């Protein structure tokens, strides 16, 4: 789960990741490396308790993690000042992501590798006056005045994660699948 609080001067990203140890691995894991760059760590918890970790320039080592656990991380990032156009950045007043090949590590601490597949639920919080359209991967689950929640049920590597927030127009059509299911299609563009 990812929760973005988009702001003009900073963005707070909260992540909640459920880890399960591979049953074919029999030895205890002493440390787990999570990629992370250009992140200001606010908090990190394992199963609701302060985590033991070692911060590095390119990520952090989670020390002595349990076999199965829930990791909650909160970071501060600055998309408004990013010029490399990786991770979450701003362009023409809109928030955009570029996660391929290794940009997701500039959004939160994560196993930023193509062989790690995850299901993403993304909550985007923003001022709708400035960012009326809030998009992410998958299906729109819920939308309120200042929030949109998206769920993508298809497991995928984090380099395929996408988020866009801003003033956009769209063209819309629908498609009927061979099973008779109606699918809405939209193409978003700057006005």
Regions found by a protein language model. Name each.
Residues 1-191:
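Acidic/His-enriched low-complexity segments
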């Amino acid at each position: 789960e990812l929760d973005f609080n988009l702001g003009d001067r900073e963005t707070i990203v909260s992540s909640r990741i459920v880890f399960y140890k591979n049953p074919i691995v029999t030895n205890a894991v002493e440390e787990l490396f999570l990629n992370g760059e250009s992140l200001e760590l606010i908090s990190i918890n394992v199963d609701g308790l302060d985590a033991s970790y070692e911060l590095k320039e390119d990520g952090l080592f989670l020390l002595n993690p349990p076999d199965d656990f829930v990791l909650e991380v909160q970071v501060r990032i600055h998309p408004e000042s990013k010029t490399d156009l990786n991770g979450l950045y701003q362009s023409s007043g809109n928030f955009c992501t570029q996660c391929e090949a290794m940009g997701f590590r500039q959004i939160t601490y994560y196993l930023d590798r193509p062989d790690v597949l995850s299901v993403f639920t993304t909550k985007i919080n923003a001022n709708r006056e400035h960012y009326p359209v809030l998009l992410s991967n998958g299906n729109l689950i819920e939308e309120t005045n200042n929030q949109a929640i998206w769920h993508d049920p298809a497991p995928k590597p984090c380099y395929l994660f996408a988020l866009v927030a801003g003033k956009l127009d769209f063209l819309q059509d629908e498609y009927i699948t061979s099973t008779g299911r109606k699918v809405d299609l939209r193409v978003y563009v700057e006005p």
